[in-house]
């Protein structure tokens, strides 16, 4: 196969996003030593607006749009995203070419004073940017106070260290990628904090017309992770199609079978619906839709319709 002479990766400029882009850069450089692989760092709208909760300003698609523009106008050949930030429906003209092997999918409890969530006194302030985490926290620990936490990973840790929060909840994978695993006091079992759709996996997006890149990027695709993430995204698409609602899903492959658990909740956690399904790994989208149907049968549509739409 003739690999291109050059490849440009579009990435957000945060430390975590650049780590992820550099990881993919290294993989590509190893696969194609003759190809020059460079990174185009970009500041996205989501990185610039830090004084409002994500749900209010348009959701996680704000982290993706500028990168897609770079793909559309030819400044970049591929974009690297955290899969949990990728909107459920890509705009026309774009495609996911590969999903990398999943890292730790769990949420991490980070605190300077407490060993785990159960040890937090009533009234403690916990920071998170995620309605998914907020609803699960409030359902399990209604005595805690959950407040919005924005900014990159280092900013969030600084706010914790300044005493603005008793604890914060972050993605374990991000902390580990940046060499900050020592900050994790507890990795929360997915049974107790169902991860975001795609959490821990990286997605590689391309201009859909660049069919030449599909073979080039194919070695980066991890079929088992891709099946799990596609099942999770299938559930989310069937229910809401947005990153910014209190839902989560986590799929695992065992042999030829996918097992998946998902939930939908009110933001305050007072209404909480959870279901599980299993089915053939070669039909991930259908499995996601089946899980969504089970949640709808329990009343998920009513909960989602009652959420504030800003």
Curated annotation (Swiss-Prot):
Its EC number is 2.5.1.61. Binds 1 dipyrromethane group covalently. It catalyses: 4 porphobilinogen + H2O = hydroxymethylbilane + 4 NH4(+). One of its GO terms (biological process) is protoporphyrinogen IX biosynthetic process. Keywords: Porphyrin biosynthesis, Transferase. SUPFAM superfamilies: Periplasmic binding protein-like II (SSF53850), Porphobilinogen deaminase (hydroxymethylbilane synthase), C-terminal domain (SSF54782). One of its GO terms (cellular component) is cytoplasm. InterPro entries: HemC, Porphobilin_deaminase_cofac_BS, Porphobilin_deaminase_N, Porphobilinogen_deaminase_C, Porphobilinogen_deaminase_C_sf. It is an enzyme of class 2 (transferase). Its cofactor is dipyrromethane. Pathway: Porphyrin-containing compound metabolism; protoporphyrin-IX biosynthesis; coproporphyrinogen-III from 5-aminolevulinate: step 2/4. Pfam families: Porphobil_deam (PF01379), Porphobil_deamC (PF03900). The modification S-(dipyrrolylmethanemethyl)cysteine is found at residue 243. It comes from the Bacteria. Gene3D superfamilies: Periplasmic binding protein-like II, Porphobilinogen deaminase, C-terminal domain. One of its GO terms (molecular function) is hydroxymethylbilane synthase activity. Belongs to the HMBS family. Monomer. Tetrapolymerization of the monopyrrole PBG into the hydroxymethylbilane pre-uroporphyrinogen in several discrete steps. The porphobilinogen subunits are added to the dipyrromethane group. This is Porphobilinogen deaminase. It comes from Methylobacillus flagellatus (strain ATCC 51484 / DSM 6875 / VKM B-1610 / KT). The lineage of its organism: Bacteria, Pseudomonadati, Pseudomonadota, Betaproteobacteria, Nitrosomonadales.
């Amino acid at each position: 196969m003739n690999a291109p002479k050059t490849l440009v990766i579009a990435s957000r400029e945060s430390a975590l996003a650049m780590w992820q882009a550099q990881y993919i850069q290294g993989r590509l450089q190893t696969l194609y030593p003759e190809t020059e692989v460079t990174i185009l760092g970009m500041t996205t709208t989501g990185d610039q607006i830090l004084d409002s909760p994500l749900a209010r300003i348009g959701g996680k698609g704000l982290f993706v749009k500028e990168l897609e523009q770079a793909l559309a106008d030819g400044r970049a050949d591929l974009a690297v995203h955290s899969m949990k930030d990728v909107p459920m429906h890509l705009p026309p003209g774009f495609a996911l070419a590969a999903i990398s092997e999943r890292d730790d999918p769990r949420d991490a409890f980070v605190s300077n004073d407490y060993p785990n969530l159960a040890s937090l006194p009533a009234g403690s302030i916990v920071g998170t940017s995620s309605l998914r985490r907020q609803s699960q926290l409030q359902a399990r620990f209604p005595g805690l106070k959950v407040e919005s936490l924005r900014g990159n990973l280092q900013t969030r840790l600084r706010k914790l260290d300044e005493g603005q929060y008793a604890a914060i909840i972050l993605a374990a994978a991000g902390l580990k990628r940046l060499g900050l695993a020592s900050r994790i006091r507890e990795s929360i079992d997915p049974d107790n904090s169902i991860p975001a759709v795609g959490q821990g996996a990286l997605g590689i997006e391309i201009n859909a017309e660049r069919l030449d890149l599909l073979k080039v990027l194919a070695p980066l695709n991890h079929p088992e992770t891709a099946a799990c993430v596609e099942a999770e995204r299938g559930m989310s698409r069937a229910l809401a199609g947005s990153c910014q609602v209190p839902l989560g899903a986590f799929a695992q492959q065992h042999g030829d079978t996918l097992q998946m658990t998902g939930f939908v909740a009110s933001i305050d956690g007072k209404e909480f619906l959870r279901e599980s399904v299993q089915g053939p790994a070669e039909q991930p989208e259908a499995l996601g839709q089946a899980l969504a149907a089970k949640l709808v049968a329990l009343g998920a549509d009513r909960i989602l319709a009652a959420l504030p739409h800003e």
